Swiss-Prot record:
Pfam families: Ribonuclease_P (PF00825). Belongs to the RnpA family. It comes from the Bacteria. Keywords: Endonuclease, Hydrolase, Nuclease, RNA-binding, tRNA processing. Its EC number is 3.1.26.5. InterPro entries: Ribosomal_Su5_D2-typ_SF (IPR020568), Ribsml_uS5_D2-typ_fold_subgr (IPR014721), RNase_P (IPR000100), RNase_P_CS (IPR020539). GO terms for molecular function: 3'-tRNA processing endoribonuclease activity; ribonuclease P activity; tRNA binding. GO terms for biological process: tRNA 5'-leader removal. This is Ribonuclease P protein component. Consists of a catalytic RNA component (M1 or rnpB) and a protein subunit. It catalyses: Endonucleolytic cleavage of RNA, removing 5'-extranucleotides from tRNA precursor.
Length: 139
């Protein structure tokens, strides 16, 4: 595995204050089940995950979501530069439509939503880091 494609401990939000500092800001984007927050830090990109029992009661589901999110972030980590990104599950998955904790439809749903959300977040980072466009001078 290449070193830059790894997901080391330094690339994760670990402490409560790190999560709190990102949560204080408004959410950037939402999907049907997830919300993403971001905060510039100037250091390397880090990911925080909040996958609570309230919205994913089964441990297998929570672990599946975490694995998919970590992999998606790991592949896009360079796009986030010096930003902390926090991904939060905010809605339950429909048990009738997705009865198994790790069914292929649930896996596909999570992957598509998380990848779409991280793509939007990467565009947001690019937009916020871009220098402001100068207004044309009129004399």
């Amino acid at each position: 595995m290449r070193a830059q494609a790894a997901f080391p401990k330094a690339a994760r939000l670990l402490k409560t204050d790190e999560f709190s500092s990102v949560f204080r800001l408004r959410p950037w984007r939402r999907t049907a089940h997830f919300v993403v927050y971001g905060r510039p830090t100037g250091n390397e990109a880090r990911l925080g995950l909040v996958i609570g029992k309230k919205y994913a009661p089964r441990a297998a589901t929570r672990n599946l979501v975490r694995r998919i999110a970590r992999e998606a972030f790991r592949l896009r980590r360079a796009e986030f530069g010096g930003w902390d990104v926090l991904l939060r599950l905010h809605t339950r998955f429909d048990k009738k439509a997705l009865p198994s904790a790790s069914s292929p439809p649930l896996r596909a749903l999570c992957r598509s939503e998380i990848e779409a959300l991280l793509d939007k977040a990467a565009r947001e980072v690019t937009r916020r880091e871009a220098p402001p466009a100068e207004a044309p001078k009129t004399e």
